[in-house]
């Protein structure tokens, strides 16, 4: 799972440039964070996107909007993203996620970055597993107001920074 920043940035840029959605107004941002992790933001002005979709990561279920680890075996296959409700925006969003997954696998397979990694006997960058879709911050009260104190958070990972932002805590990098 070790991916150099240069490779992560290069693959992200390549995906952003080469992925073409069936909805021509749809754009994608692939932002490398730490190690092998990225955030993927799909945006389109043509329709509101939904967080009510399944994960493509076979090791995690989406239960009540939360990612929950599954008991899994050795071989895992990327799952197709499905709508969790019979609404047009959920179906539309699931379709965009599936288009992203299918195209990104092909793009990474043919990438010059992967050819270079192969020459260096490094593992190939093969897919991006998506989980825990969201289209808005959760509506939670500020922890500072709730407890009438001033809280802060020492953060090291993007998820910790996100939690501190949602709860309106001041964040300090570790």
List each model region and its residues.
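Feature captures the catalytic ectodomains and active-site-proximal regions of enzymes
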Residues: 1-174
């Amino acid at each position: 799972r070790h991916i150099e920043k240069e490779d992560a940035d290069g693959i992200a840029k390549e995906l952003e440039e080469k992925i073409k959605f069936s909805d021509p107004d749809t754009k994608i941002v692939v932002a490398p964070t730490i190690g092998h992790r990225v955030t993927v933001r799909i945006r389109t002005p043509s329709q509101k996107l939904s967080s009510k979709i399944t994960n493509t990561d076979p090791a995690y279920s989406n239960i009540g909007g939360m990612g929950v680890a599954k008991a899994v075996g050795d071989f895992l296959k990327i799952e197709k993203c499905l709508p969790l409700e019979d609404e047009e925006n959920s179906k539309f969003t699931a379709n965009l996620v599936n288009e992203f997954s299918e195209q990104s696998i092909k793009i990474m397979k043919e990438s010059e970055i992967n050819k270079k990694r192969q020459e260096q006997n490094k593992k190939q960058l093969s897919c991006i597993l998506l989980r825990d879709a969201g289209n808005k911050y959760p509506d939670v009260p500020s922890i500072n107001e709730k407890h009438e104190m001033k809280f802060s958070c020492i953060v090291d990972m993007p998820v910790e920074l996100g939690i501190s932002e949602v709860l309106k805590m001041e964040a300090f990098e570790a």
